[in-house]
Amino acid sequence: EYKADGIDNTDAIKGTYLDNDKQIWDLYLNNSTCEPSMISSKTGDDAASEFSLGEAVFYQNGTWGYHDIKDNEVAEEDMGMLPIYIGVDGEENQGLCTGSENYWCVNKNASEEDIQATLDFMKWVVESDEGRDMLANQMGFVTPFTTFADYLPDNPLVKANAEYTKAGKTPVSWNFTTMPSENWKNNLVGALLKYAQGTGTWDSVQTAFVDGWAEEYAAANE
C-alpha cells in the first residue's frame, strides 16, 4: 500500500490489500504443522525446530534466523529464501523485504567515561578481526559497515538475498518502524488468532488493522 500510494508513513492505513493478506493467512493456517485452532500454542522455537529437522517446508524469518536452523537435518545447500507473493501486479519484479528496526545507541546522559567506553567497544566490534568474525561468521549477520569487505558471512540466506539483488529485483521497503504502536500490533494479532480459532471474523481483522491504526496513531501523536 505504501508503494502504491507513494508514501513512507501514514496516519490512516486503508487496508487496500487485506483480501490478499487473507489468502496468505488462510494458506498458512491450512498448511501448518498444527491445527489452526492450536497456533497460539506454538512458539518461535517450535517453528525453528520443525524447519531445521525437516518437519516443515517453510519458516518465515530473516537472515538472522540462520543461527537457529543451521547444523541440523536440512542441508545448507537446500536452504533459500522466497518473497511472500500476494497476487499483486508487478510483484514478480520484487525481491525480499530488507532493512532493520534496531539501532546502536549511546546514552548521552551517561558519564563521559561510560560513553567513551561504549564508543570504543562499538569500534572494536566493527573494526577488529575478532569483532568482525563474531558478527559475520559466528552470528551470520549481514552488516552495512564498510569494514566488512573481507568478512562476508557464510550464510546461505544472506547469499539468497544477494542473488535477488544481483538479478535486479527491487527490495521491499522495511516499514515495521512506522507501525503506530505496539498496542496496534497486539490487537491485530488478537484478531488474527480469533479468526484462526474460528471465534472471530475477517471483518474483525480488518477493523483492528484499519480503524485500530487510525486510533493508535492519533493517541500516539496527541
List each model region and its residues.
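Long, aromatic- and glycine/proline-rich binding clefts that accommodate carbohydrate-like moieties
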Residues: 83-86, 136-186, 190-194, 219-222
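Glycine-centered hinge/linker elements that transmit conformational signals in sensory
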Residues: 2-41
